[in-house]
Amino acid sequence: MQTLSSIINAIVPLDNVAMARTATRLNGLVKPTGSFGRLEHLAIQLAGMRGLSGHHIDRKQIIVMVADHGVYDEGVTISPKSATAIHAQNMMKGITGVCVLAENAGADVKVVDVGIDSDPVPGLVNMKVERGSGNIAQGPAMSRQQAEDLLLASACLTLEQITNGVQLFGVGELGMANTTPAAAVVSVFTDNDPQQIVGIGANFPSERLHHKVAVVRQAIEINRPDARDSIDVLAKVGGYDLVGMAGVMLGAASVGLPVILDGFPSYAAALAACRIAPDVRHYLIPSHLSAEKGSIIALQHLQLAPYLHLDMRLGEGSGAALAMHLVDAACAMYNNMGLLAESNIVLPF
């Protein structure tokens, strides 16, 4: 039986020998050395992941964690709270942004209810902790035990999907007001004032942004999360969707498989996961630079450079779906290009 400790202890660094071998092969392909730029770096990163059998990925999946947030009551979003459950239903119909992009990328979408403030939505994986987290502006989002249990449950869900053949994961989230706890988590882990982190989320009016900043600042002051303790931070100022995404990262990394990040809330979850197990970072693939204000700061602390710059801020896992094409391209380059030595071409470099 898996425990959170056993999953964390199974996370190891990338295989440097395999990565060096891949770099040598890439340098021998029919192209100038390094001319594929970061696509080559991606192929080398994938080579170091012991869960992959060469550069072959047969099944891809985006896990979307869905939850409501008590801090919604502080007026930090203009979207109706009911939109969380309604949009989760739309995901089951396959008509949302992530569903369309995932289908285009050859990936399936698994939608998980970790805390929707509604009755169970048909078709969703039911891992509901509560009907919405606590209001972080008034107290903790959840208990420490709830955070630990959800981390483990999410990691185990990921391991279950791996037994079903999934080799590449993306993470996504859905939940009205969730950029507020995400901003709180990023503020704590990066030691920045919320003024530097808080953004407009789902079109929150810029003239009211000072209120959202104040709410995040109040949440941190009231809960006093310990930045050295990821679970404490997630429990006090996070949310069920953030915890769920962090659990996916831990689970995939524990068996050496990659996880593609999405936008700002996934950066918050990644910061937490990497504090729990620093080697998780090597299994993360940053898809795009979210347009949310604190994104650059979060990614700098993760030491990750996003591949795509599209001014996106939809969430759901939409950026992860787009980046799956890049992973496919890196594998195709490695597997299918010819060798320079067999091309009758002699390059001066």
UniProtKB/Swiss-Prot annotation:
The active site consists of 316
Entry keywords, A to Z: Cobalamin biosynthesis, Glycosyltransferase, Transferase
The cross-references to InterPro entries, in alphabetical order and at most eight, read: Nict_dMeBzImd_PRibTrfase (IPR003200), Nict_dMeBzImd_PRibTrfase_bact (IPR017846), Nict_dMeBzImd_PRibTrfase_N (IPR023195), Nict_dMeBzImd_PRibTrfase_sf (IPR036087)
Its pathway? Answer: Nucleoside biosynthesis; alpha-ribazole biosynthesis; alpha-ribazole from 5,6-dimethylbenzimidazole: step 1/2
GO-annotated biological processes:
cobalamin biosynthetic process
* Uppermost EC category: transferase
Q: Which PANTHER family match?
A: NICOTINATE-NUCLEOTIDE--DIMETHYLBENZIMIDAZOLE PHOSPHORIBOSYLTRANSFERASE
UniProt record similarity statement = Belongs to the CobT family.
Role this protein plays: Catalyzes the synthesis of alpha-ribazole-5'-phosphate from nicotinate mononucleotide (NAMN) and 5,6-dimethylbenzimidazole (DMB).
Query: What is the name listed in the Swiss-Prot or TrEMBL entry for this protein?
Result: Nicotinate-nucleotide--dimethylbenzimidazole phosphoribosyltransferase
Annotated source species: Photorhabdus laumondii subsp. laumondii (strain DSM 15139 / CIP 105565 / TT01)
Q: What is the lineage of its organism?
A: Bacteria, Pseudomonadati, Pseudomonadota, Gammaproteobacteria, Enterobacterales
